[in-house]
């Protein structure tokens, strides 16, 4: 009985679809075809314009360069080059980067330049306990990122913004979170040297990590890694949500 009812429903559905297809040419007068085509083309153009507007608007909000360019700095410390970013904590603004970017260089010789060519005046330096992170105090209110306090999700879209290859230009690298730990996350965004200190942003434009290091995991002796992402280059970003900061002398 149930089988017959299902069969009748399928036949009824096919009949109605056929009837609609048969009636559509009759329902639309021939004289209206040209007007309909013109209207359709105009609508297509408007939809294209609207799509471009939405793309531009959302790129400012989804962790992209447009909404972040006034918060990024190119860092040069001796022979080292990397990335820094401004983030607000409470009422204070700090410039964050990796400790290895400025290692062995006096704070007075660290140069952090915003993309509008403003050189930041760096104040007191603090180092993260047990992590490759430092931050410098900044004076005055400045455009700044906010920290994402929630634990990120695997599969979440992220953007890495920074001084890729240390060539003095900021690039935008997109990818996803593919691993989450208490102190770091793993991403598939292909950042490289020079991106050390780059903010890793979620779609809301908040900081979920600091691009910090790559690990070459190629191991031909371990057959279990063959044809997996664990037998290649892996990329990690340090989380900031539970860092303990210590003053530097």
Q: Whereabouts are the PLM-identified features?
A:
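N-terminal secretory signal peptides that target proteins for export/translocation
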Residues: 1-12
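Bacterial N-terminal signal peptides
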Residues: 18-27
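C-terminal cap/linker of serine protease catalytic domains
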Residues: 34-63, 207-249
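Catalytic-histidine neighborhood of serine endopeptidases
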Residues: 35-37, 43, 47, 81, ...
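A conserved glycine-rich beta-strand in the N-terminal activation segment of trypsin-fold
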Residues: 58-61, 70-95, 120, 197
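Short conserved beta-strand and strand-loop elements enriched in small hydrophobics
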Residues: 73-75, 108-116, 158-163
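A generic structural motif
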Residues: 93-97, 132-138, 185-187
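Flexible, gly/ser-rich surface segments that form the specificity/activation loops bordering the active-site cleft
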Residues: 142-195, 211-224
